[in-house]
Each structure stands twice: as C-alpha cells, then as structure tokens.
Amino acid sequence: MKFPSKEQIEQYRREYPVGCRVELVSMDDPQAPTKGTRGTVRGVDDIGNLLVRWDNGSGLNAVLGVDVVRKIRG
C-alpha cells in the first residue's frame, strides 16, 4: 500500500474537518459497518486514515483512497 504525501494528508484534513458528518459508501473490511452508516469525523491521522466515530458505536477507521465515504449535512 502506498501512503499519501503530506500534501494529500493536509488536503484530507481540509476536506474532512473534525466534527463533520460522513456516510459510509463502501469499506473493504469484514468488520465494516453496513453501507449507509453515518458517523462523525474525529480527525485524519498521519497515514491518511479517516478517524470516525460511527453512529452504531464502531470506531473502525476509513482508509481514504481505499474505502469510500461521503460528506453529509449534520
């Protein structure tokens, strides 16, 4: 797996600020929340993982560039 550049990480952080809401479109993980699950962004780590507190209680991170989430309104 190729890690994103510092510039890409900063772009992710601007695109997904702490507190914004997202909805899961797809995730390549057997423990993934179901499609359509919503959550609140807690941040983006230094390797490009989107840290999300999913509304179903899951804390599984989304890997930007692999998993797909979309921003939603509150």
PLM feature segments, named:
Residues 2-74:
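Basic/aromatic-rich interaction segments and small domains that mediate binding to polyanionic partners
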